[in-house]
Amino acid sequence: MMYSPICLTQDEFHPFIEALLPHVRAIAYTWFNLQARKRKYFKKHEKRMSKDEERAVKDELLSEKPEIKQKWASRLLAKLRKDIRQEYREDFVLTVTGKKHPCCVLSNPDQKGKIRRIDCLRQADKVWRLDLVMVILFKGIPLESTDGERLMKSPHCTNPALCVQPHHITVSVKELDLFLAYYVQEQDSGQSGSPSHSDPAKNPPGYLEDSFVKSGVFNVSELVRVSRTPITQGTGVNFPIGEIPSQPYYHDMNSGVNLQRSLSSPPSSKRPKTISIDENMEPSPTGDFYPSPNSPAAGSRTWHERDQDMSSPTTMKKPEKPLFSSTSPQDSSPRLSTFPQHHHPGIPGVAHSVISTRTPPPPSPLPFPTQAILPPAPSSYFSHPTIRYPPHLNPQDTLKNYVPSYDPSSPQTSQPNSSGQVVGKVPGHFTPVLAPSPHPSAVRPVTLTMTDTKPITTSTEGEAASPTATTYTASGTSQANRYVGLSPRDPSFLHQQQLRICDWTMNQNGRHLYPSTSEDTLGITWQSPGTWASLVPFQVSNRTPILPANVQNYGLNIIGEPFLQAETSN
């Protein structure tokens, strides 16, 4: 399959990766994958590769398409970026690119406080220490995964245990290594036939020919060539700054860099990946992503300062939760990101906007537009499908304004437009609980979210029929994602409530309950103190809801794929 920059996912175009990719040695792809192939072969056949098989694998990897090599290197750099502490990532790029004097770059330790080991993109079950990976990637030294004991840290290194700065890592050379280096040098010089080395006395003795056997498949010239060649050389895809498709919020809009990528990214052919964009990195007007301290771009805020604007790491994933999930305003407000007040090339007409990086809601199965359910956004904010709430508004207060209160003691709480409305089928995997309608007087259907299709079991131990009860308790052992327990700890929790009579097929204590024309039926209360709903079973007798005084254990489950018909209750 032909890979190109257009095929790569967004996380492979982070400026951290774009700045470091030209400094990755070409030997890294061949070396890591060759060791993985040898490991897989040994596990499968319980014997080592022959020299001919290993040489064939080496030639295959060396002749691999450049786009595949770059894609592999981009993914590995993205993985290494997460293993480096956030406050050291900028220093790492500046030192590797030669724009700053080498300093310590600390990595995140493992559970034992030692340096991490990674599998280099799940290549067999072989793991490599981070400092080994750095030496192979940026210095092109072909080390084995067991050569960690040969690595030594520079005397200037302040934390040798966790530092992954390539300039602080050296390889200890033993006497045997020096002897072999001299032997190989003399052997190559003797084969060159130059007059200066034609003296037989200077040639290596003949007995040395039988003393060493080369176990690898690389010769000296191949090793030198691939260790000195960047992985981006001769590929035709050298990631020029003017042609790199990048996210608009990675760049300073004052720099005048021509960006050609919009917010939307083409879908990947593989499994969905998490796109981590928790750090902003700015290019300079000259095209460098990391300006030197003397450049004009460095006079603004640093990368670490810009990270503070992003209150929390922002991840964009495939929607796996309901649009209005059980979240609090403290959980949702840090996700809002303030963008620079400049024109965004990927978004026409964006200016002075505050938008959230949450994913848009999934397609709604309802027969009416979902947009009509959401409260209208203020006109001073950019209208975008990912917009949630402005940072100065409380999501709970916003939704609470549209939920009419219900007084159990009031005999009538009728609402106009009380005709029943059929809600679409509930999917088996998930359906979000819908938000209240902007119009308080309108009838709003309630869609229940259930994870399986087992019969309904409603256990209401200790229920006492009391129509005037206003406080409910539920046991703490309630099953997650099945129902929500009410708690009297928060008085505002029971402030807003609305009763609905829902017709469904139930199974209680082994007998089926069907919707009947009698006056006694079952229903639920739907309380919305913010962005989530709690379901409480109740009974309606003579058009009067009878709420349980003490609900200890209860659960609701829909059978199959029912239709829920919402009606208003008096």
From Swiss-Prot:
**Positions of modified residues (Phosphoserine):** 264, 292, 295, 312, 328, 333
**Might you report a single GO cellular component term?**
cerebellar mossy fiber
Where does it localize?
A: Nucleus
In residue numbers, the region (Disordered) covers: 252-446, 455-474
Question: Where the protein is mainly located, per its record?
Answer: nucleus
The terms under GO molecular function for this entry are:
DNA binding; DNA-binding transcription activator activity, RNA polymerase II-specific; DNA-binding transcription factor activity, RNA polymerase II-specific; RNA polymerase II cis-regulatory region sequence-specific DNA binding
Q: Which SMART domains match?
A: DWA (SM00523)
Q: In which tissues is it expressed?
A: Highest expression in lung, skeletal muscle and heart. Lower levels in liver, kidney and brain. Very low levels in testis and spleen.
Which PROSITE patterns does UniProt cross-reference here?
CTF_NFI_1 (PS00349), CTF_NFI_2 (PS51080)
Keyword entries, A-Z = Activator, DNA replication, DNA-binding, Methylation, Nucleus, Phosphoprotein, Transcription, Transcription regulation
Amino acid composition bias (Low complexity), ranges on this chain: 408-421, 464-474
Phosphothreonine carried by residues: 286
Positions occupied by motif 9aaTAD: 397-405
Q: How does it assemble?
A: Binds DNA as a homodimer.
The free-text domain remark for this protein reads: The 9aaTAD motif is a transactivation domain present in a large number of yeast and animal transcription factors.
* Protein name as catalogued: Nuclear factor 1 B-type
